[in-house]
Every structure is written in structure tokens, then in C-alpha cells.
Amino acid sequence: MKKSGSGKRGPPDGNHQSAAPEKVGWVRKFCGKGIFREIWKNRYVVLKGDQLYVSEKEVKDEKNSQEVFDLSDYEKCEELRKSKSRSKKNHSKFTLARCRQPGTTAPNLIFLAVSPEEKESWINALSSAITRAKNRILDEVTVEEDSYLAHPTRDRAKIQHSRRPPTRGHLMAVASTSTSDGMLTLDLIQEEDPSPEEPASCAESFRVDLDKSVAQLAGSRRRADSDRIQPSSQRASSLSRPWEKPDKGAPYTPQALKKFPSTEKSRCASLEEILSQRDTAPARPLHLQAEESLPPVPAQPGQLSRIQDLVARKLEKTQELLAEVQGLGDGKRKAKDPPQSPPDSESEQLLLETERLLGEASSNWSQAKRVLQEVRELRDLYRQMDLQTPDSHLRQTSQHSQYRKSLM
């Protein structure tokens, strides 16, 4: 009989040779598959320390065993049972699974115990031996007195990380989802122990992006409000550029942000507080701020009449086009031959579609004309009511004074 390739890793310990084995007994070992059935052979197994000795007959000295297996090459010992099998043999099988590390040559071992109780006893004993073998490898690690263990995170070099300022697109996205007055909170956090020689380029770029985004946001909102209250003829003259000063023609240049002292590690400031820290421009009035304080411009009396004239001209033009298209379609229908050709049918469909669209446009213009006429009548009615209200108030005052005189 030749011995297995997996032997001991080192010289045997004297304590292991003199100590009594943990467990001994006869079990059946799986030796392969034959032509018709599996081959199982009785073997005498001795568990001593972290070594497993297997021999064909009972021996007093473990050195005479045919096979020696080092349990440090194995990962676990567990029960081996088929789920759908009812055979008593399958209730007593257990296996030693080898480690899956590269270079391991130990084979997987399968045993069959005499009874399920004996199987549980072998599994517990082999599992404890495998654990001791793994711990023995760890206990063999020695540390010299001169060497020391460095802390992996505490002793490494510190690297200063500078925070990147928010981009312009991010500021616009945050401002669009903020409250109606445009206030948004910016988290200005400075890193600990900033280097004194670091330039203030980040702060300057942050100030430029912030001022541009705020000016564009405020201008777009106020421009929308002014478009709703001002007529179309005055929109071009009323719009002013938010980045230009009203008193000077030169464009406004944003100022750099103040550098916070090192004592302020982190600070949460609002947009209003940041803009109030500007030194060079303490008072910067804008045309847009003046437009906010002005009352809404009332509609001009002639505006409604101009709209009515425009609607009337559009209605007349639409009706002329509709009549022209209808005449063209009637002429084609009269001059058309009895057999239809595909181009004639397509042109006829195009004329019908054009006629339908012009008819819808004509009805829409007519409806707009009626609505404007009703608006004009309502405006005249409100004017008459406003004129009659002071006269009725005077009459009530005179009647009240006459009633008081009669009482006196």
C-alpha cells in the first residue's frame, strides 16, 4: 500500500506522540465506484492531534498507518445525505471537505459510520480537530521585539482635500426648487488647517458664479411679472440688464468673497447674508428694483379697440382665403374627368384639409370678436356704475342731513 501524497507539514511534536488519541474506531471508507456499485472498505481510523491516521487493520503505532492526513488542509466536516433517499446507509455518511486554496493536494474523504450516533461523534471530534489545526497555524506566527505594528489609518500621512465649489448648473437647479423669494441655503464648509499659500481662486470663481446665477434668476422672474402687467409696446424699453449699473455704462464686475477665519470651521449662511458682505458696492440700485415699487400700469382705453380691429382684419383675411380655397375646389371638381387618378385625389384631399383648417380659424376669430364685444360692453357698464356711485352717495348724505334737521 502506498501512502497518500499529503503528509505532515513539519516534524511531529513530542506532546502529540505521547498524548492519547482523541478518537479511534472502525468506519467504512469510500474507495471509488465499480462497474455496478460503489466500493466501500473497512478502515481503522485514529484521530490524534491535528492528524488523521487510516489503516487497513488495527495498529498500536500510528507510524505504521497506510494513510496520514493533515487536518489543516481541510475546511470542514459535515454530514452527507441525499435528500430523496430512504436508505439507512445515507443517514450515517459524513465527509471531510478540503480547502479550496490553490496548491492544496489533499483529497475529499467520505466515510460511513456504524450508526447515526457514531456519525455525530466523528463529526464533532473532526470539527474540533480542524479548528485546533487552523489555530495552531496562527499561533506559530512570531513577532520580533524590534518590530512594531503600525496603525493602518492613524499613522498614515494626512492629505488636505479642498472642497470644490458648486457649479452654476447646480445653483440654478437648487434655486428653481427653492422658495418663491429665491432664498436658498448654501453650506460653506472649510477644511481644517487650510494652507496659507493656497490661492483664493476657488472663492473668486464661486462668487462670480453665484452673482451671475442670482442676477439671471431675479431678472427672469421680474421680467415675467412685468410682461403680464405691461403692454406689448413697452416691453422692449422696460427690460433692463441686471448685470449693468444704472448710473454707469460699464458692466458690473463681481467682487471676491471674504476669506473666513480658521476659527470658523463650518458655517451655514443664506444667500442674503452672503450678498450683504460686499464691501465695494454697499448700495447698488437696479432698474428692476424700481419697477417692483411701481404700481401696475392700467390698461389703455384704446387698447381694446386696437385688439378688436386686429381681430376683425384677421377674420376678414381668413374668410377671403376660405372663399378662394372653396372656389378653387369647386372648379377642380367641375373640370375633373370621371376616372380619378392618385395625384388628383391627393390634391383634392389637401384642398379639403386646407378648407377645414380655414373654417376652424374663421370660427375661432368670430368667437374672439364676440368675446371682445362682450368685454367692451362690460367695461362700459362698469364705467356707468362708477359714475353713478358718487351721485348716490351725495344723495344719501343729503337725505341723512335733512332727517337730522327734522329731528332737531
UniProtKB/Swiss-Prot annotation:
Location of region: Interaction with ATM, CKIP, IFP35 and NMI: 135-307
Alphabetized InterPro entries for the sequence: PH-like_dom_sf (IPR011993), PH_domain (IPR001849), PKHO1/2 (IPR043448)
Keyword Nucleotidyltransferase: no
Gene Ontology biological process terms in this record: lamellipodium morphogenesis; myoblast fusion; myoblast migration; regulation of cell shape
Origin: domain of life: Eukaryota
Site feature Cleavage, where: 309-310, 344-345
Main localization of the protein described in the UniProt heading: membrane
Alphabetized UniProt keyword annotations: Cell membrane, Cytoplasm, Membrane, Nucleus, Phosphoprotein, Tumor suppressor
Span list, region Negative regulator of AP-1 activity: 307-408
Lipid bilayer topology: Peripheral membrane protein
SMART domains in the cross-refs: PH
Species the sequence originates in: Mus musculus (Mouse)
Organismal lineage: Eukaryota, Metazoa, Chordata, Craniata, Vertebrata
Biased segments, Polar residues type: 229-240, 389-401
Its biological purpose: Plays a role in the regulation of the actin cytoskeleton through its interactions with actin capping protein (CP). May function to target CK2 to the plasma membrane thereby serving as an adapter to facilitate the phosphorylation of CP by protein kinase 2 (CK2). Appears to target ATM to the plasma membrane. Appears to also inhibit tumor cell growth by inhibiting AKT-mediated cell-survival.
Region (Interaction with capping proteins (CPs)) residue spans: 132-192
Record protein name field: Pleckstrin homology domain-containing family O member 1
A GO CC annotation given for this chain: cytoplasm
Domain PH: 20-131
Site for Interacts with capping protein, residues: 154, 156
